């Protein structure tokens, strides 16, 4: 009798394990799989539909000194960049580009290297931000440059530099993907009036990963 009870108990445990595969040691629970449903008395997982890729995302490979553009998960342009030096490294992590600045003015940040620097107006040839700026982690950003020879090198104080022609094209794409579309007259104006700063906030910030 005791042997029969033991066998029945082991059988019940085995059945219990069979109907609950969604709660294993790897954490593949019902929450991660999606919803749950009951079928024939057993709890089963309903597969979750993967979230779609954002309209646009950026990745920066600091070692390769490259910026990669993705549209809806598909690879687009690969652009050369300058990154921070060993002393002033570019911060890694995941961020969101929330603002595009055309013809940015440069205000020296409150950091040791900029203590004796002076501000540079929009459009000034000595302005280190170039023609456009993508803000993701103030004061650091992706921006143009007045030193195109630095592209492909570790040369900045933490920001990511691009050639002016590249940042202008990328800024337009970021605005469109971020829900801040403008017509061609807007872009003609900001390129023509280089001494006038234009700030555009993005309703849908564009994700960027720096590694």
Language model features with spans:
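Cell wall/extracellular polymer interaction/catalysis modules
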Residues: 21-110, 119-133, 193-198, 206
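Exported/periplasmic cell-wall-interacting domains
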Residues: 22-23, 46, 111-211
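Residue-level signal for mature regions of secreted extracellular proteins and peptides
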Residues: 11-12
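Bacterial N-terminal signal peptides that target proteins for export
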Residues: 1-7
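C-terminal motif of bacterial Sec signal peptides marking the signal peptidase cleavage site
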Residues: 15-17
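Short amphipathic alpha-helical segments with coiled-coil-like heptad repeat character
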Residues: 2, 75-76, 168-170
């Amino acid at each position: 009798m005791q042997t029969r009870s033991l066998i029945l108990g082991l059988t019940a445990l085995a059945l219990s394990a069979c109907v609950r595969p969604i709660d294993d040691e790897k954490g593949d629970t019902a929450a991660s799989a999606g919803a749950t449903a009951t079928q024939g008395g057993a709890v089963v997982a309903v597969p979750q539909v993967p979230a779609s890729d954002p309209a646009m995302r950026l990745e920066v490979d600091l070692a390769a000194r490259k910026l990669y553009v993705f549209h809806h998960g598909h690879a687009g342009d690969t652009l050369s960049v300058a990154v921070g030096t060993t002393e002033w490294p570019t911060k890694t992590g995941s961020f969101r580009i929330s603002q595009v600045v055309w013809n940015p003015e440069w205000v020296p940040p409150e950091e040791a290297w900029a203590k004796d620097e002076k501000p540079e107006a929009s459009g000034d040839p000595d302005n280190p931000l170039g023609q456009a700026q993508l803000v993701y982690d103030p004061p650091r950003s992706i921006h143009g440059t007045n030193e195109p020879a630095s592209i492909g090198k570790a040369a900045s104080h933490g920001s990511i530099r691009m050639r002016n022609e590249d940042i202008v094209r990328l800024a337009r794409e970021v605005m469109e993907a971020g829900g801040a579309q403008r017509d061609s007259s807007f872009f003609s104006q900001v390129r023509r009036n280089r001494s006038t700063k234009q700030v555009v906030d993005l309703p849908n910030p564009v994700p960027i990963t720096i590694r």
